[in-house]
């Protein structure tokens, strides 16, 4: 996908990997970049606008845990303004295994609901034009960080959901791929809670191993957007972008 001239919605795009990715996206000249996030950050919005004044950067408050109908309502407002949307990035995520219900609600259910909501406008069975979705999952969807099993499971669920949607593209007209960052040096990983406090020093131990910067991850994120490969499972780790070949152990046959 050539980003230039496109209309993009980025969920949770004002911090960490999301903000750095949006810094790279605006350099490529989309027509509109719409950021949905829980907390407004006027300084970040102004910075993105200043990077490329030819891009219209806008913000709408959004919590991915709201009811599906609320997500549809917000997207209806955005589509009424932009007329078309080319790319949706689902980037909401938390890392705190003390918050079991919220971890699942944000990392998995929120992705499902926002995706389901945009199908109201994209699904070709309803006369929609189709579209592209990039879901930010995690390398923990491949192999868990066992001290945070809830987080790891939520990301594995998001990855499975994404892979299923890619298989449905001939029916819906919506193509989908997953973005799976490795351990990235952001505030998210500097302090977090393990499940039942099984490892109080989990963040410290994790950061003892090589990491990548959010900027390096962001640059590879944009490369994945440009590649625009339906069903791709992208690993963004240690400054590299690699497509993962998933090992099939079972097939429904349908």
From Swiss-Prot:
Listed EC numbers: 1.1.1.1
Superkingdom as given in the UniProt entry: Eukaryota
Keywords: NAD, Oxidoreductase
GO cellular component terms attached to this protein's record: cytoplasm
InterPro entries registered for this protein in UniProt: ADH_Drosophila-type (IPR002425), NAD(P)-bd_dom_sf (IPR036291), Sc_DH/Rdtase_CS (IPR020904), SDR_fam (IPR002347)
Chain positions recorded as NAD(+) binding sites: 10-33
Annotated catalytic residues: 151 (proton acceptor)
GO molecular function, one term: alcohol dehydrogenase (NAD+) activity
Subunit and interaction comment: Homodimer.
Protein name: Alcohol dehydrogenase
Gene behind this protein: Adh
């Amino acid at each position: 996908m050539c980003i230039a001239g496109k209309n993009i919605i980025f969920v949770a795009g004002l911090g960490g990997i999301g903000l750095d990715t949006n810094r790279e996206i605006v350099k490529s000249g989309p027509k509109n970049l719409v950021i949905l996030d829980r907390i407004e950050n006027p300084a970040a919005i102004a910075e993105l606008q200043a990077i490329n004044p030819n891009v219209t950067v806008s913000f709408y408050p959004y919590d991915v845990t709201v009811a599906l109908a609320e997500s549809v309502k917000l997207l209806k407002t955005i589509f009424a303004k932009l007329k078309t949307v080319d790319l949706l990035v689902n980037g909401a995520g938390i890392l705190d295994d003390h918050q079991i219900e919220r971890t699942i609600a944000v990392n998995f259910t929120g992705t499902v609901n926002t995706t389901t909501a945009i199908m109201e406008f994209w699904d070709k069975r309803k006369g929609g034009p189709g579209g592209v979705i990039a879901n930010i999952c995690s390398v923990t969807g491949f192999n868990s960080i066992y001290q945070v099993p809830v987080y790891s499971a939520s990301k594995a669920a998001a990855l499975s959901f994404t892979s299923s949607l890619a298989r449905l593209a001939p029916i819906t007209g919506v193509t989908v791929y997953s973005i799976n960052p490795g351990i990235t040096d952001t505030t998210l990983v500097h302090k977090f809670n393990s499940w039942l406090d099984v490892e109080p020093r989990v963040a410290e131990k994790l950061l003892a191993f090589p990491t990548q910067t959010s900027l390096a991850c962001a640059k590879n994120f944009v490369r994945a957007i440009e590649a625009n490969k339906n069903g791709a499972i992208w690993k963004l780790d240690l400054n590299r972008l690699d497509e993962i070949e998933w090992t099939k152990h079972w097939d429904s046959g349908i």
